[in-house]
Regions:
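Flexible, acidic loop-helix segments that line cofactor/substrate-binding pockets
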Residues: 1-5, 21-53, 70-79, 96-101, ...
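Glycine/threonine-rich helix-loop capping motifs at alpha-helix boundaries
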Residues: 2, 11-39, 53-68, 87-94, ...
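Short beta-strand and adjoining strand-loop segment in the mid-core
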Residues: 5-12, 84, 172
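Short beta-strand segments
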Residues: 7, 66-68, 130
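Helix N-cap motif at beta-to-alpha junctions
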Residues: 11-13, 47, 111, 135
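Phosphate- and divalent-cation-binding pockets in alpha/beta enzyme and binding domains
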Residues: 15-16, 50, 137-140
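Conserved C-terminal structural/oligomerization subdomain of aldehyde/semialdehyde dehydrogenase
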Residues: 28, 72, 79-248
């Protein structure tokens, strides 16, 4: 899955963004089959147009394009430059849609709770990652994010470990692949019940009577009494009613 949004703590955002831009400018774009290539092309013309639309929407909404922002025509028709976007907010349309392109919109937060709220403010929830020097804090934040996979200080772990389930929440799909959960998606669950009392009607069979209703109530009181001693004490009375119904 691609990184669609990035939230950075406000007090380090400027320095962090500066480093990201430096790294991005050094990325080598070209054909994916070439070993020297860091980033390839888009998958289609239509997808390239979606990325162009999102970049323009960011600009029109007040965000700042720090590097990239258009097609890399020297590389080919559907090559889009790696693009870093500053001052993005969740109110901007592309932050609520899937881009699937080489864009990195950066938004900021002040508190942990705000970061969680911003991360969850989306109709999608496939994957997320939390980056922190405090592992217990990272685990705590990860548990609050509504995504099928949340990594702490990691990005591609689930792609290399087949035992980890893969799937999303909300509009990011349903079900799972990989792992035990993925295997169970291919299993047809069948329930088989065998009545050991041959030719003896159960109390819930047709037809019904006032006595049958009272028996069901007695069964509910017996097994929901909240006390083992009380349950044992009610069993004889319940069993008597069941035998009366079976012999009707």
């Amino acid at each position: 899955s691609s990184v669609e949004r990035l939230y950075v703590e406000e007090k380090i955002a400027d320095e962090f963004t500066k480093l990201v831009v430096e790294k991005t400018k050094n990325l080598r774009q070209g054909l994916g089959k070439e070993a020297e290539t860091d980033i390839g092309s888009m998958s289609s013309e239509r997808q390239t147009e979606i990325v162009e639309d999102h970049v323009k929407a960011f600009e029109d909404s007040g965000a700042e394009i720090l590097t990239g922002g258009g097609r890399n025509e020297e590389a080919g028709d559907i090559f889009f430059e790696p693009t870093v976007i500053k001052n993005a907010t969740n109110k901007m349309r592309p932050m609520q849609e899937e881009t699937f392109g080489p864009t990195l919109p950066i938004a900021t937060f002040k508190t942990e709770d705000e970061a969680i709220d911003l991360a969850n403010d989306t109709e999608f929830g496939l994957t997320a990652s939390v980056w922190t020097g405090d592992l217990s804090r990272g685990r705590r934040v990860a548990e609050e994010i509504l995504a099928g996979t949340v990594n702490v200080n990691e990005v591609l772990y689930t792609h290399g470990i087949g035992q980890t389930p893969w799937g999303g929440f909300k509009n990011s799909g349903y079900g799972r692949t990989h792992g035990k959960e993925g295997l169970m998606e291919l299993v047809g669950v069948q329930h088989i019940h065998v009545n050991r009392f041959l030719f003896t009607p159960d109390v819930w069979w047709f037809g019904y009577s006032k006595n049958a209703i009272e028996t069901f109530k007695q069964m509910s009181r017996t097994f929901a009494s909240g006390s083992i001693i009380r349950t044992i004490g009610l069993l004889p009375q319940m069993w008597k009613r069941i035998k009366e119904l079976r012999n009707k």
